[in-house]
Regions:
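Aromatic-rich transmembrane-lumenal/periplasmic boundary elements in polytopic membrane proteins
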Residues: 1-55, 262-302, 406-411, 415, ...
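Membrane-embedded helix bundles of polyisoprenyl
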Residues: 2, 88-106, 112-197, 208-226, ...
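Active-site lumenal/periplasmic loops and adjacent helix-entry segments of GT-C-fold
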Residues: 4-107, 111-119, 123-146, 179
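Perimembrane helix-loop-helix junctions
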Residues: 181-264, 375-380
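Signature aromatic-anchored transmembrane alpha helix within multi-pass, membrane-resident enzymes
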Residues: 213, 263-272, 368, 372-406
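Alpha-helical transmembrane segments at the extracellular/periplasmic loop-to-helix junctions
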Residues: 237-254, 261-342
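Hydrophobic/aromatic-rich transmembrane helices and adjacent perimembrane loops
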Residues: 323-324, 347, 352-385
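Extracytoplasmic
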Residues: 390-594
Length: 594
């Protein structure tokens, strides 16, 4: 119910609205997969025109989305993909709660499992990423991670090896960042081995070893076919094989008494060592990337440190996500038996503090720890006392559900879906109508007829709703050769240089927004210097078009030349600017492209 509570926001005006930009590219890739099912494209000419782009996401998640839409492939592929894509996060969210209950039961009592499940069902951080319409790979990854951890916690029970193998394999083929999951599973296994008997320790090590070896073998053909050469964390590559072999060697070290596993572990270790020279630098870059230390993240709020989410120290984002649950978790984590859970919490919370999107990853072990803690407290204190204390611990998280003045951006029902607050739907509908369907819409291997140059965060919307190729998009620089060049168009002063970029990327339409305040942030994303003052900023071609139109303007003792663009669409919505009210969005056609 909590995950479906935004139904009227997602299914509105006869359309399906996905929350956030990345979900729209998941839809496009699934749409491309439907054209040639079961082959999932690894590159796409519709992005980063004219070079095209490598897709950083492994194929499994988008292949799953396409497979679910197969019955409607001939009749209504776009509408069915949108509806399935909107429902899938909520379904995965319910599955995640069930897996949390199972894992908690393996770690503690039946009552602790039910409490952890109840917490997970309503905990805002878990609900936020599994709300109806919040299409992305995150809940899929968390479910695979839980499956692998269930296997480790269940050892030496029957099926534990299969669970770990399935979890790690699905994770690797579903998200390039799943190396984080491999590390968490390995750390969890090492901690559990430390607290277990010698017989159980061998089974844990065997499960970790076999699961990673099998996952490495299954992933190998995909790595060899991947457009990402060498080793990199940005896409499925030899770096992932290195991580899997390293985790397999760690498993063999735990089960060193098993001679066959020890020999296999030695072979895995040699393989990891052989790949280490090409993987060390990607590993360092991956750590910095996971920690949010990359220039391109300057303009992406969810990649900022949790306590500095908006550029200044602020506890509220952390309190709304977690409440005081970390304090409650200490009650459960102080015992040696819960060392595996404590290890998981420390790793996940550390990642969340560095990179706020990992709050979702950290919420799962916190819910489990909270369930165990409340169970222990109920054994020592009255129910009323424990209920009051628990309510106080989660009180800050209620901001996500209740309307509190000043916190609308954190509330599930008051926050605005990004695409609907941007005037992008109208612009996308216009772009879709201006010409016949582009051949590259259904075939990612042919060159698009022309492209649209729009602010990076509009790229996926334009590709899916507008059905037009783009130069830059929310993939940022990952696999996108045109990203830096396209960003320079939006942040650097100089009309002639901007026109060269337009010609270089086969641009026919330009989308502009009056957003002077974002220039420093966008410039930082490519390591560029922003304009120093308003006089210089208005020489940034998109700012000229957004505030003044394409005509010549004399201002600030300077002359701003007329630009070879024709305005073809503008939004009804307006916003105030330094020169009066201006449209929230405008679309221009490049005159030389007529």
């Amino acid at each position: 119910v909590a995950r479906l509570s935004v139904w009227t926001k997602v299914f509105a005006s006869g359309r399906t609205w996905i929350d956030g930009p990345d979900g729209y590219y998941h839809l496009r890739r699934a749409f491309l997969t439907l054209q040639r099912w079961p082959r999932v494209p690894l590159t796409d000419s519709f992005m980063s025109v004219p070079s095209g782009s490598r897709i950083s996401w492994p194929p499994l998640f988008d292949g799953l989305l396409a497979t679910l839409a197969l019955p409607w492939r001939a009749s209504a592929p776009i509408a069915s993909l949108e509806r399935i894509g909107a429902l899938l996060p909520a379904i995965l969210g319910v599955l995640q709660v069930a897996l949390i209950v199972i894992l908690t039961r393996l770690l503690a009592s039946h009552r602790a499992a039910l409490i952890a499940g109840a917490c997970a069902a309503f905990f805002p951080t878990l609900v936020r990423y599994t709300l109806l319409g919040t299409l992305d790979h995150d809940p899929f990854f968390e479910c695979t991670l839980l499956l692998a951890l269930i296997g480790i916690a269940a050892a030496p029970r029957r099926g534990s090896i299969a669970a770990v193998t399935a979890g790690i394999t699905l994770a690797i083929l579903g998200w390039a960042g799943s190396i984080v999951g491999v590390a968490i599973v390995a750390a969890f296994a090492l901690a559990r081995a430390f607290t277990s008997s010698s017989e159980t320790r061998i089974e844990i090590g065997r499960a970790l070893f076999l699961a990673n070896v099998i996952a490495a073998g299954i992933a190998l053909p995909f790595v060899m076919a991947s457009p990402w050469e060498g080793a990199t964390f940005e896409g499925l590559s030899w770096f992932h094989e290195t991580a899997l072999l390293g985790a397999a060697a760690a498993g063999a070290a735990i089960a060193w008494r098993d001679r066959r596993v020890a020999i296999g572990g030695a072979i895995a270790l040699l393989g990891a060592i052989a790949l280490l020279p090409i993987s060390l630098l990607p590993a360092l870059r991956g750590l910095l990337y996971a920690g949010g230390h990359a220039p391109i993240f300057a303009g992406v709020a969810e990649t900022q440190p949790l306590l500095f989410l908006f550029g200044r120290f602020d506890l509220w984002p952390a309190l709304i996500r977690f409440g005081f649950l970390p304090l409650l978790a200490v009650v459960a984590l102080r015992r040696k038996a819960q060392l595996p859970l404590a290890t998981w919490c420390i790793v996940a919370l550390g990642l969340a503090l560095l990179h706020s999107r990992f709050s979702y990853t950290a919420a799962t072990p916190l819910c489990i720890a909270a369930g165990i803690a409340v169970d222990e407290l109920l054994a020592a204190h009255s129910r009323i006392r424990v209920a009051i204390m628990s309510a106080l611990m989660i009180a800050p998280t209620l901001i996500a559900y209740l309307p509190i003045p000043g916190f609308a951006a954190f509330n599930f029902y008051e926050r605005t879906t990004p695409i609907l607050s941007s005037a992008a739907p109208g612009a996308c509908d216009f772009l879709r109508s201006v010409a016949a369907e582009d051949p590259a819409l259904r075939n990612p291997y042919v060159q698009p007829a022309w492209s649209v140059l729009a602010p990076w965060y509009h790229g996926h919307w334009i590709m899916w709703i507008g059905q037009r190729a783009t130069v830059i998009n929310p993939m940022l620089s990952v696999g996108q050769p045109a990203f830096d060049d396209g960003m320079r168009f939006f942040v650097r002063a100089g009309e002639s240089n901007a026109m060269e970029i337009v010609q270089r990327h086969h641009v026919r339409y330009v989308v502009v927004t009056p957003d002077l305040a974002s220039l420093p942030t966008q410039a930082a994303m490519i390591g560029s210097e922003p304009p120093q003052d308003l006089r210089e900023a208005m020489h940034v071609l998109p700012m000229h078009l957004a505030y003044w139109g394409a005509s010549e303007v004399r201002a600030f003792g300077d002359t701003y030349p007329a630009l070879p663009f024709d305005e073809v669409w503008r939004s009804r919505e307006v916003r105030p600017g330094p020169f009066g009210l201006v449209p929230l969005m405008r679309v221009y056609r490049v005159r030389s492209a007529v």
